[in-house]
């Protein structure tokens, strides 16, 4: 076996891609900070039970497991940073008011999520803890869209759903609640024949409402149809009102409502939003409310947030991250050394061409040169 081979769906990040990823990481983290988000850095490795407090069977299957040589306990390589940030908020910070946190780090998956997807993503995201009102969801949705616009993306489609609709329907019918997981699978897959079979012996109102969900998709006007076809329950009314406000706030993007798009239903407790762009089949960013996520750490707090994969974002982003630089000669010259140091202190990239390699400069566009004129080193256009 060749020693340079890597595992399937694992790849090195080469300079051009790494430069673009880092440019996007800095842009997004700076934008998060402008909203008041504080950065945290959870560890890549934790005890397995801490990592799997939420997310269900899917998260367990995606998590790499190994044995700690010090304690003998099972450890996990994180597959999602969100539960770790919830642990920090609930157990370490222990604040009473609103807390805004953000993060950026690697996550590992046992299996890729798509044919060409990597198993090592660079997850970046933001979370708000401590506010149950829709205002927090509106801020997170706006921040997610800001992040995508900062990456140069256009023609964004925002899909909206709400976990509260299905939860309210199941809560009013114990027989339906017993089939909750099967109903969730049928709705998520838009499997209408299976949905008809699962609801065949349910009450007429519950059956009609559940069977209506796969057909309640489209632009924001579909919410009016949903109000007409779904039971008048406080939870459903509130969910539809929330979706209407989220749709109204999303300026400059195409908004779609899909009341059966329940991916992550077991994890979320309220509004869910997913961003797509033309030409890319999979979601580029996901977010939503998950008020119960901190419960396993002894302190359930209202929470909402979003995340995305920086490597995928860099792949589709049109921004040009190739930096400009100043080309300087290599010489044992104190004045040259002082000039180079001063330029670097001022934030310039200065590349000193090693002897015999004056023209081998792939990663930077050297648009200026440092040259000696009348005994002084000055920068000139190339």
Curated annotation (Swiss-Prot):
Pathway(s) where this gene product acts: Amino-acid biosynthesis; L-histidine biosynthesis; L-histidine from 5-phospho-alpha-D-ribose 1-diphosphate: step 1/9
One GO cellular component term noted in the UniProt record for this chain: cytoplasm
Similarity remark: Belongs to the class-II aminoacyl-tRNA synthetase family. HisZ subfamily.
Cellular localization per UniProt: Cytoplasm
Listed name of the protein: ATP phosphoribosyltransferase regulatory subunit
Subunit structure: Heteromultimer composed of HisG and HisZ subunits.
HAMAP family the UniProt entry points to: HisZ (MF_00125)
InterPro entries in alphabetical order: aa-tRNA-synth_II/BPL/LPL, HisRS-like_core, HisRS/HisZ, HisZ
Keywords in alphabetical order: Amino-acid biosynthesis, Cytoplasm, Histidine biosynthesis
Example GO biological process: histidyl-tRNA aminoacylation
Pfam families (UniProt xref): tRNA-synt_His
Single annotated GO MF: histidine-tRNA ligase activity
Job of this protein: Required for the first step of histidine biosynthesis. May allow the feedback regulation of ATP phosphoribosyltransferase activity by histidine.
Miscellaneous comment: This function is generally fulfilled by the C-terminal part of HisG, which is missing in some bacteria such as this one.
Domain of life: Bacteria
Location, primary (coarse class): cytoplasm
